[in-house]
Structure formats: C-alpha cells, structure tokens
C-alpha cells in the first residue's frame, strides 16, 4: 500500500488498504490513509465509514473527530454530534468548547451552548475567547444581565480592549440602562483614543436613548440628544465608519435636530451660556451639551 501511495496509484492503494481493513487491522494511520484516499476520489460515504471505524476503537482521537466533522461540513451534513463528542471527551479544551457552542447557537440551541461554555470556563478562567463567546450566547438568549457580568469579567482580564467595553455598553442599552451604557461607551472612547468605531457607538447610544425617551412630539431635550447623536455619527463617518448611515439620514430628513428656531425659544439666561443641555429624568445621565452654531 505504501508503495502504491508513493507512486500516486490511488486505486491500487485503496484496494490494498481495503484488504488490510477486511483483515480487521486497527492501525489508525493505515485507516486514516484509506479515508483520505476515499476523500480524494469523492467517495464521502466510504470516507465517513472508515473514520467512524477508527473512532469505534479510538473514541477520544480528537484529530479523527475533527477530520470527520470537516468531512460532514464539506458534504453539507450537520456535524453537531461530532463536535459534541469531541467536546465531551475534552471538556477542558477551550477551542473544542467554543466550536461546539457556535454550532449549537447556529442551530438555535442557546441554553445548551451556555452550559457547554460555563463548563469549560471552570477549566479556562483566563481564556478571553470563552468569556467573549459566553457573553454573546447570553446576549442571544436575551439574558443581558448575565452577558454584562461575563463581559465585565473579561474586561478585568483585558482592560485595554475597547470592543469589550462597547459590548458591555450595548447590553446595558438593551436594558434601557443608558447611564451605565454611557459610562462604558466613554471608557471605550478613552481606550480607543476616539476611534471611529467608538464614536459611532456613542452616536447610536444617543440615538437609541432619544427614541426610548421621546414622546409623539419632539421636545427641545429630545432634539438636543438627536443633535448629539448626529454629531457623533458625523465624526465617525469622517473617520471612515458609516455603520449607522441610515440613522444619520433619518435624523437629517425628519426635522428632529436642534436648530436656530429652537435656540431662539430658549430663555435668555440659557442663551447667554452659548450651549443647551438636555433636561428631564430620562436624560439626567447626559453630561454633554449642544453648542450654539454661528448662524443661530
């Protein structure tokens, strides 16, 4: 068989390997070569059968488990059971846990994904990717408080990761906790040194807060927050991030930005300061102001 393999005579090699297989040989390398040869010829069913045979006497062989999963995926079949077996045989392996959890989430089995990740976290309590994937699973499960706790633990491990701060902020936004969301968004902005992604996130935070707080008619405070959102969207766009271009366009087209007419409706003592701040309990976390424009 080895001679045929060296000569590139695949058919002859397969015949020889099949003869060895029929003899009951349990040599993993031999059977793996046979599986590869089947794969080269597109004989997927036979390839799967041989790989499964290897696992029947060597069930913890992670390399064969991975190979079988790859074959399943390339043939369009669901390899979930393979990923599950590999994870259960190696619960301390973070990569296997993450891959299995991702497959579960793709199938909508979020609770099972969370269980798998929490299990492996006991072995990998300093693995950033486990925390990040678990945080995403909690978020998909609408368990935003647990997502926040998990991501805060991750932030303690990686305090210079502005994207983790943004994710924590996003989960607070899901709970309409805009004060906490702003605190984490500000951290992201400081860590990233005002990069485009962090700027666009704060713009979206203001945009969502405005929509959560406003009534049927836009108050001056609603318009002030809308203008803050617009300002951040514009800054992010200037740095190449147009993620929220639809929201920015909506603000432009719906007469919700604080403008000249709104300015002249303000009390004189506010006009004297040259800026206006949002007011009201819903906006009591907003510390920024809208500055008077030159044409007001």
State the predicted function of each range.
Residues 39, 44-62, 69, 73, ...:
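TPR/TPR-like (Sel1-like) alpha-helical repeat modules
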Residues 85-92, 235-296:
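Terminal, low-structured helical/coil segments at or just beyond the last alpha-helical repeat
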Residues 1-2, 6, 16, 29-36, ...:
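Canonical tetratricopeptide repeat
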Residues 27, 61, 93, 127, ...:
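Residue-level recognition of tetratricopeptide repeat
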């Amino acid at each position: 068989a080895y001679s045929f393999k060296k000569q590139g005579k695949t058919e002859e090699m397969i015949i020889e390997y099949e003869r060895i297989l029929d003899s009951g040989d349990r040599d993993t390398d031999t059977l793996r070569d046979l599986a590869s040869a089947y794969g080269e010829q597109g004989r997927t069913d036979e390839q799967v059968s041989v790989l499964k045979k290897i696992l029947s006497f060597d069930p913890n062989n992670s390399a064969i488990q991975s190979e079988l999963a790859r074959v399943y995926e390339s043939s369009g079949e669901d390899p979930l059971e393979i990923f599950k077996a590999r994870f259960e045989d190696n619960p301390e392996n973070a990569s296997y846990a993450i891959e299995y959890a991702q497959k579960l989430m793709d199938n909508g089995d979020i609770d099972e994904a969370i269980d798998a990740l929490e299990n492996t976290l006991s072995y990998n309590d300093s693995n950033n990717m486990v925390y990040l994937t678990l945080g995403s699973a909690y978020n998909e499960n609408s368990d935003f408080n647990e997502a926040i706790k998990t991501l805060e633990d991750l932030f303690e491990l990686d305090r210079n990761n502005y994207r983790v701060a943004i994710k924590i902020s996003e989960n607070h936004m899901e709970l309409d906790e805009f004060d906490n969301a702003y605190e984490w968004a500000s951290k992201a902005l400081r860590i990233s040194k005002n990069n485009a992604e962090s700027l666009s996130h704060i713009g979206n935070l203001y945009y969502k807060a405005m929509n959560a707080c406003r009534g049927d008619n836009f108050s001056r405070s609603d318009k002030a927050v809308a203008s803050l959102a617009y300002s951040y969207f514009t800054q992010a766009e200037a740095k190449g991030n147009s993620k929220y271009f639809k929201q920015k366009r909506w603000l432009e087209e719906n007469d919700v930005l604080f403008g000249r007419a709104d300015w002249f409706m303000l009390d004189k003592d506010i006009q004297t300061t040259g800026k206006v701040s949002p007011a009201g309990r819903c906006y009591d976390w907003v510390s920024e102001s809208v500055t008077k424009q030159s044409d007001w």
